[in-house]
From Swiss-Prot:
Lineage: Eukaryota, Fungi, Dikarya, Ascomycota, Saccharomycotina
Motif (Q motif): 15-43
Localization terms from the record: Nucleus, Nucleolus
Primary location: nucleus
Protein name, as recorded: ATP-dependent RNA helicase DBP9
A Gene Ontology term for the protein's cellular component: nucleolus
Domain named Helicase ATP-binding: residues: 47-229
Keywords: ATP-binding, Helicase, Hydrolase, Nucleotide-binding, Nucleus, Ribosome biogenesis, RNA-binding, rRNA processing
Database matches in PROSITE patterns: HELICASE_ATP_BIND_1, HELICASE_CTER, Q_MOTIF
Length: 594
C-alpha cells in the first residue's frame, strides 16, 4: 500500500520509524498501513515527545502528517504504561480534542489502524459519533477506554454529567487549534483546563496551521516549557506543481450554465467536489443539475452527523462522483496577509525552545470578534476532512477569504496525486444582473481574487485564467433557462424538507439497524433525485446538433434512399396484398351512403 496520509514533499527520507524504538506491535501496524519513512514534522516531534517528554506546539499545514506526529507518542507511552503496571484496571489516559465531528471520525479511523495488533490493551472511543446513543455511550465509557476523541463541547457535557473521569490523564491533544478557537470553543477549553490533573504528569500537544496570539494564550493555559515546531511550507511547496489552478470570470447565471456543460459533456474526469457558500445554493444547484439527469449528493450542516459521515465515506469509496458541499466560512476573519509567520531559514523544521520565545503584552491587543455559527458548529468540510482521490475542486461560489480558498483547494492533489481547481469569479459589473441566481458574497469576488492571486504567488503558485469558448456554450443556454426556471424558491424549500426527512429516517436506521447489519449500509444512497421541481425529461438528453463537432458521434452514411416507399409497408405495419384487405372505397362511409 502506498504512502497515503502525507504529501510526498513532506517525507523525510533520511529517517525511518525504526529509529524511534517503538513497540513491535505499533511498528507492525505502521508498516501494514504502508508508511516507510516519517514526515518532517513526525521525525522532529516523536523523539521530543517520547525521549524528552516535552510538550509540543506544532505549526504545519494539511498533508504534513500531523495526526501520526501525536498519535504515535500517545499509543507508545500507553503501551509502556501497560507493561510497567500489568495490574492496571484501565483508565482514560489520552484525550484528543478536534473541532468537528467529521475530523473526530477521521482520527478514530487512524487510531484503529495503529492499535490493530494491540486492541486488547488499548481501546479508543469517539464521543462525538452520531451513531452512538446516549445510553450506549455511557455503557461504553464504563469500560474505561484509554483514548477518547471528542469536540470540546461534547467532552464538557460528559464531564458535567460525571460520565468521564480524567484524573489519571497523561496526554491532552488539541488538533487544528486555530479552527477550534474559530468555532468558539474557548470557554469549553477553559472549563477543561480547570479539571485537568497537575501539569507535571500531563503531556500536551497543540497542532495548528498557524501560530497567533490566541494560541499563545492556550500555551500558557495548557503547556509546560513546550518545544515549538515550525514547518516551513514554502520550501516544501516549491516542489509541488501537481495542482493546476484556474479561475473563470463569468456572470451569475452563467455559473449554472457552465456547470451543466462541464458535467453533462464529461469535461472533468474523476470525482469533483463543489463548494457553495450557503445551504440554499447547494440545493438550487442540485435541483438544476437534476433537470438534466446529472446526479449529485449534498453535504451541509443541517444533515444529521451520521448521515454526513456516511456521505463522506461513500464519496471516498467512489460511490458518488459529484459532491456539493456547503462551506459556511463567512465567520472566519481574514487575517492580515503581511503578518505571516516568520519564515525559517535553517532547515525545513525549526525547533524553538519556549524559554527563548518572547511575547508582547497580549492584553493591550483587541481580540478579533468571533461570529457565532447558527448551524451545527461541529460541522466542517473544507478543513481537516480527508476526501480521497478528488480530481477537481470547483469553487462554484468563491470563498470570502484567501485563507478559506487554501483549505478548499487542499482537498485535491493530495499524497502526490495531480488535481485541478476551478473558481468561478463574478465581475463587479455583472453582479446583480440576474437576481434569482445572485449571492451577496459575489460582490467582493474580484477583491478576494486579488488577495488569492497575491497569496498563491508568495507560495510560488499561479492562478491561470480559463477562457471558455462562449460560442460553443451558447447553444445550451435556452435549455438551461428552461431548467433553471423550474427550480423555484418554493421547490428549494420543499427539497430541503424532503432531504431532512429522508436523512433523519436514515439516521435512525444507522443508529439502530446498521450497527447489527453493516452490509445493509450499502443500499443507502444520498444522491437520489429529490424531484420537488417539475422535471422535463427531454432536457436529460443532449441532441447531437448542440455538441461540439469533436464530440458528435460519427453518423454513418445511409446511402441511396428511393423516393417511392416500399408499398408493402404502410405506417410501419405490413399490409398484405391478397384479398383479405378490402378496398378503401368500399369502407368510405360517404361513398357508401345512400
Amino acid at each position: 500500500m502506498a504512502q497515503t496520509s502525507a504529501s510526498q514533499g513532506y517525507i523525510d527520507d533520511s529517517s525511518s520509524f525504526d529509529s524511534f524504538h517503538l513497540d513491535s506491535r505499533l511498528s507492525q501496524a505502521i508498516r501494514s498501513i504502508g508508511f516507510k519513512h516519517p514526515t518532517l514534522i513526525q521525525s522532529s516531534a516523536i523523539p521530543l515527545a517520547l525521549q524528552e517528554k516535552r510538550d509540543i506546539i506544532a505549526k504545519a499545514s494539511t498533508g504534513s502528517g500531523k495526526t501520526l506526529a501525536y498519535l504515535i507518542p500517545v499509543i507508545q507511552t500507553i503501551l509502556d504504561h501497560k507493561k510497567a503496571d500489568q495490574n492496571d484496571e484501565g483508565a482514560t489516559l489520552g484525550v484528543i480534542l478536534v473541532p468537528t465531528r467529521e475530523l473526530a471520525q477521521q482520527v478514530l479511523e487512524v487510531v484503529e489502524k495503529l492499535i490493530v495488533f494491540c486492541s486488547q490493551e488499548i481501546k479508543c472511543l469517539n464521543l462525538s459519533s452520531g451513531n452512538v446513543s446516549g445510553n450506549l455511550l455511557k455503557s461504553l465509557l464504563t469500560e474505561n477506554p484509554e483514548i477518547l476523541i471528542a469536540t470540546p463541547a461534547k467532552l464538557v457535557d460528559l464531564l458535567d454529567a460525571q460520565d468521564v473521569n480524567i484524573d489519571r490523564l497523561k496526554f491532552l491533544v488539541i488538533d487544528e487549534v486555530d479552527l477550534v478557537l474559530t468555532f468558539g470553543y474557548q470557554e469549553d477549553l477553559t472549563k477543561i483546563s480547570e479539571r485537568l490533573p497537575l501539569r507535571k504528569s500531563l503531556q500536551t500537544f497543540l497542532m495548528s496551521a498557524t501560530l497567533n496570539d490566541d494560541i499563545q494564550h492556550l500555551k500558557q493555559q495548557f503547556c509546560r516549557s513546550p518545544a515549538i515546531l515550525k514547518l516551513n511550507d514554502d520550501e516544501v511547496n516549491k516542489d509541488q506543481t501537481k495542482l493546476i489552478q484556474y479561475y473563470v470570470k463569468v456572470g451569475e447565471f452563467d455559473k449554472f450554465l457552465l456547470c451543466y456543460v462541464i458535467f453533462k459533456l464529461g469535461l472533468i474526469k474523476g470525482k469533483t467536489l463543489i463548494f457553495v457558500n450557503n445551504i440554499d445554493r447547494g440545493y438550487r444547484l442540485k435541483l438544476v443539475l437534476e433537470q438534466f439527469g446529472i446526479k449529485s449528493c449534498i453535504l451541509n450542516s443541517e444533515l444529521p452527523a451520521n448521515s454526513r459521515q456516511h456521505i463522506v465515506e461513500e464519496f471516498n469509496k467512489n460511490v458518488y462522483q459529484l459532491l456539493i458541499a456547503t462551506d459556511d466560512t463567512e465567520y472566519i476573519k481574514e487575517e492580515d496577509e503581511d503578518l505571516e509567520s516568520e519564515k525559517t531559514e535553517d532547515g525545513l523544521v525549526e525547533v524553538v525552545d519556549d524559554s527563548t520565545v518572547t511575547t508582547k503584552d497580549n492584553a493591550k491587543k483587541q481580540k478579533k470578534p468571533k461570529l457565532n455559527v447558527e448551524k451545527d458548529k461541529e460541522y466542517g468540510v473544507s478543513r481537516g476532512v480527508d476526501f480521497k482521490n478528488v480530481a477537481c475542486v470547483l469553487n462554484f461560489d468563491l470563498p470570502t477569504t484567501a485563507k478559506s480558498y487554501v483549505h478548499r483547494i487542499g482537498r485535491t492533489a493530495r499524497a502526490g496525486k495531480s488535481g485541478i481547481s476551478i473558481s468561478f469569479v463574478v465581475p463587479l459589473k455583472e453582479f446583480g444582473k440576474h437576481k434569482p441566481s445572485m449571492i451577496k458574497s459575489a460582490k467582493k469576488d474580484e477583491k478576494i481574487l486579488g488577495r488569492i492571486i497575491k497569496q498563491q504567488a508568495k507560495l510560488g503558485f499561479e492562478l491561470q485564467p480559463y477562457n471558455f469558448d462562449i460560442k460553443q456554450v451558447e447553444g445550451f443556454r435556452y435549455r438551461m433557462e428552461d431548467g433553471f426556471r423550474a427550480v423555484t424558491q418554493v421547490a428549494i424549500r420543499e427539497a430541503r424538507i424532503k432531504e431532512l426527512k429522508q436523512e433523519l429516517l436514515a439516521s435512525e436506521k444507522l443508529k439502530r439497524h446498521f450497527e447489527e447489519n453493516p452490509h445493509d449500509l450499502e443500499s443507502l444512497r444520498h444522491d437520489k433525485e429529490l424531484h420537488p421541481a417539475r422535471v422535463q425529461q427531454h432536457l436529460k438528453r443532449v441532441p447531437d446538433y448542440l455538441l461540439p463537432e469533436t464530440a458528435r458521434k460519427d453518423n454513418k452514411k445511409i446511402g441511396f434512399v428511393p423516393f417511392h416507399k416500399n408499398s408493402h409497408r404502410k405506417n410501419g405495419r405490413v399490409v398484405k396484398k391478397k384479398g383479405n384487405v378490402q378496398r378503401k372505397g368500399k369502407s368510405d362511409p360517404l361513398k357508401s351512403f345512400k
